Amino acid sequence: MVYDSLDVPDTLDFHGMDIEVARRHVQIQIALYLIGKQFGYETWIAQNDKGIKYQGKALLEHEGILKSISEKPLIGPYSGASNAGRFIDCIWFAGDLDIPAVMEVEHTTGVTSGLDRMKNFRDHIPPIGSRYVIVAPDEDRDHVLAEGRKPMFKDMDVRFFPYSSVEELYILCQRRHLKGITKEFLDCYMEQVN
């Protein structure tokens, strides 16, 4: 899989993450944005990742990237929702009243913190039936499933979206220019945890 012109500025804080792991994180985040764009979704990218440059311009300047999460009707009116969503890696919005997926790109050590961030976000928005997705390397599957099955996350629709499935879906989108995709189609690429 080829990622066009990706620039990860030295000023971004990846919390001690190895540069290759950080680069992979950003590559997957961009693939998620491009998949969402293909499906007609607007995408929120974590506030701390907005300085990443892709194809010569900041992510924030790309079509379909939300500049402010609080501008969405499902977020703005609800106390604490904007703050709770600010650092979530990727949120897809289908119009103003649907969130097909809330996603955290994680590696083994960050799975629980990603689930915690998504749970906090979910607790600040109205009940909408979204998917709460951990996007992680394929080899982290067992760890993601174990963490997602903990009692504190039981009432969430937690899913595992392995990197290989992200890349497969990205390539399919690029080759076939998919349209009219349903959430059920997305479910084919994500494993339900509970």
Model-derived features with residue positions:
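Domain-level recognition of nuclease-like catalytic cores that cleave nucleotide substrates
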Residues: 138-194
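Catalytic cores of nucleic-acid endonucleases
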Residues: 73, 77, 81-88, 98-162
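Short, solvent-exposed linear motifs at loop/edge-of-secondary-structure regions
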Residues: 26-41, 93-111
